[in-house]
């Protein structure tokens, strides 16, 4: 069984969907009238599996997960709008996209954000609003795979390198037909995902 095309798009507020064209290994299409049941078990590929790379992203980076490349600790965050993160010698540029986690005292500082570089040691989190006072902790990780959409939710206003990168997942399709015969195949699902930040 081969999946010829699979797409998954996740607009804000909607659920994922898949589109696929399926045929068996010999190219004989199994029609719906012949099928008693179809089951699909989807699971992620282990880190390090080989996948195709697009948009300039190297295969090693693609295989390491959604957030790759630079990362560093956070030593401060302002109680201001937008939130300004202190991270010495961060090396980021305006319009880069980061995932922030582990910041204590300001819950809104955690998440995925486009950033604006303030100086060599600080950057602001675009569209953020503080809801507390920084106490400690936090790390940020540079994201290569996220697109930032404008207020109209349609215009891409910024993205990391490789924002079109497809993710690879594996799935088991089990097709039972003619009551007694069952075909089970492991297939690769190349998934393209757009996430609003």
Predicted features by range, described:
Residues 68-144:
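Small/polar beta-strand repeat architecture
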Residues 1-68, 142-197:
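Contiguous segments within soluble domain cores/interaction surfaces
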């Amino acid at each position: 069984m081969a999946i010829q095309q699979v797409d998954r798009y996740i607009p804000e507020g909607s659920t994922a969907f898949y589109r696929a064209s399926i045929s068996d290994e010999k190219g004989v299409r199994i029609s719906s009238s012949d099928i008693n049941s179809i089951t699909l078990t989807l699971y992620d590929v282990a880190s390090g599996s080989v996948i195709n790379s697009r948009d300039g992203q190297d295969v090693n980076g693609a295989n390491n997960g959604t957030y790759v490349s630079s990362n560093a600790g956070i030593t401060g965050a302002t109680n201001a709008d937008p939130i300004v993160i202190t991270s010495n010698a961060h090396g980021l540029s305006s319009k880069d996209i980061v995932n922030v986690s582990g910041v204590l005292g300001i819950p809104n500082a955690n998440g995925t954000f486009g950033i604006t570089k303030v100086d060599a040691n600080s950057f602001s989190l675009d569209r953020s609003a503080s809801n507390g006072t920084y106490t400690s902790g936090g790390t940020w990780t540079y994201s290569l795979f996220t697109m930032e959409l404008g207020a109209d939710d349609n215009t891409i206003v910024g993205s990391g390198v490789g924002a079109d990168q497809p993710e690879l997942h594996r799935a088991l399709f089990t097709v039972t037909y003619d009551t007694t015969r069952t075909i089970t195949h492991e297939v690769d699902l190349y998934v393209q995902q757009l996430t609003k930040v």
